[in-house]
A protein has these predicted regions:
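Active-site and adjacent substrate-binding regions of carbohydrate-active enzymes
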Residues: 1-402
Length: 402
């Protein structure tokens, strides 16, 4: 048992793991391979034995011995000071941590120093439960215990101060409750897209498509995923071909992509982050091969700096199954790709409207990027009627136009 990854006393690599020098070497090795290192910052709470508890009790939400007697699971006595355990407003407190007071000016200054130190050791930071520090959320959670509400937001104070010394470091918000845009306005470069995940799990294709109608200035800064440390394993949540379809959506939509440890080989057992062991699970070789092909494909510049377009699609008076289909294109110079996904349990058909005005008077080869099947289509028909597609449940096209 590793203990809690959120119960942080100090942001320094343990000596038995090599200390800061080992982290610096690991970062250099990653950078040499074209990778960047992202570290975690937990802003909402710290370990009960954090030095601030004794040196700066004013940095925390405090209580009384009456509070402790009344709600012993909500408060803790730390050498004569009663502090609130960390929490979010919808769940019981976390018993291994104490709650910082995000409204306290001293705490904000100390957090800036802490994050500046972290930023010197990495290329980006994932900020745990970042929305809990927003003034509205914090005030609603802690009310009078928090004291006077500041005129500025926590992240508006912290992020610019850190970037003044480390301008290239990325800030990534773990975000819930549809607060992604507000966190972006507070300075975050990227935010988790939990809403798309929920739509893929629970909703239909029209819901997913509606989500993707947002402006690209917003979508480009979302982190798309179908699995992370909090959610159940994708292989357990998206049975059979549904995972393939969901993965194609997440990988080929605008924005950053998060692939979680064990997702590629199809692990199904969700593990607490406190454990350093896991049960043996046979790898899903077919799924792993699919992910390797998909990730190699989306590594191309086309899917990062190309022009993305959400496609219209239509059906026929006696066939409305086009509602089960989502489609979009990417274009960069002469390169162009169409992605079509059937997000349903039903065989579905549609005509997909393409955004390109130079299709006429050409014959086009449509090559399946992920399996190299090839189709030949007339450009006049593509321009006038759109591309006819017919897909089995949870199947997709990933078509390169030549």
């Amino acid at each position: 048992n590793l203990g809690s990854a959120y119960c942080v006393r100090d942001y320094v690599v343990a000596a038995e793991l090599g200390g800061p020098a080992a982290l610096a070497q690991a970062r250099a090795e990653l950078n040499a391979r074209g990778l960047r290192l992202v570290l975690d910052f937990v802003p909402n709470h710290v370990a009960i034995d954090h030095p601030w508890a004794l040196q700066h009790p004013e940095y925390f939400i405090r209580g009384s011995y009456e509070d402790l007697a009344r709600a012993p699971n909500d408060f803790v006595d730390v050498k004569g000071e009663v502090f609130a355990h960390g929490r979010d407003p919808y769940f019981p407190p976390w018993g291994d941590v104490i709650q910082v007071n995000a409204f306290n000016a001293g705490l904000r200054a100390a957090a800036i120093d802490t994050v500046t130190t972290i930023a010197a050791q990495c290329d980006g930071m994932r900020c745990d439960m970042a929305m809990l520090l927003l003034n509205d959320i914090f005030e609603r959670t802690w009310s009078a215990r928090a004291g006077r509400r500041p005129t500025t937001e926590y992240w508006q104070d912290l992020i610019p101060a850190v970037k003044a010394k480390h301008p290239d470091v990325l800030f990534i918000a773990e975000a819930y409750w549809d607060l992604e845009y507000e966190l972006m306005q507070n300075g975050f470069d990227y935010c988790y897209d939990k809403r798309l995940y929920d739509r893929l799990v629970h909703d239909n294709a029209e819901s997913v498509r509606a989500h993707l109608t947002a402006g690209l200035d917003y979508q480009d800064r979302l982190v798309r995923f179908i699995e992370n440390h909090d959610e159940p394993r994708a292989a357990a949540t998206f049975p059979g071909q549904k995972e393939y379809a969901a993965a194609v959506v997440v990988a080929s939509a605008p924005g950053a992509k998060l692939i979680y440890d064990g997702q590629i080989e199809g692990r199904k057992v969700k593990l607490p982050v406190f454990l350093a062991r896991r049960p043996p699970e046979p790898p899903d070789d077919e799924l792993a091969a699919f992910y390797r092909s998909l990730l190699n494909t989306i590594h191309a510049d086309l899917f990062h700096v190309g022009e993305w377009h959400l496609c219209d699609r239509h059906g026929w008076p006696d066939n409305a199954s086009f509602h089960n289909i989502v489609a979009w294109t990417w274009r960069l110079g002469a390169e162009r790709t169409l992605v079509v996904v059937n997000l349903s349990d039903f065989r579905s058909q549609a005509r997909v409207r393409l955004p390109w005005d130079d299709l006429r008077d050409h014959t086009w080869r449509l090559v399946e990027t992920l399996n190299w099947e090839c189709y030949v289509r007339d450009g006049d028909e593509l321009s006038e009627q759109g591309l006819f597609v017919e897909l089995d449940p949870w199947r997709y096209h990933f078509l390169k136009f030549e």
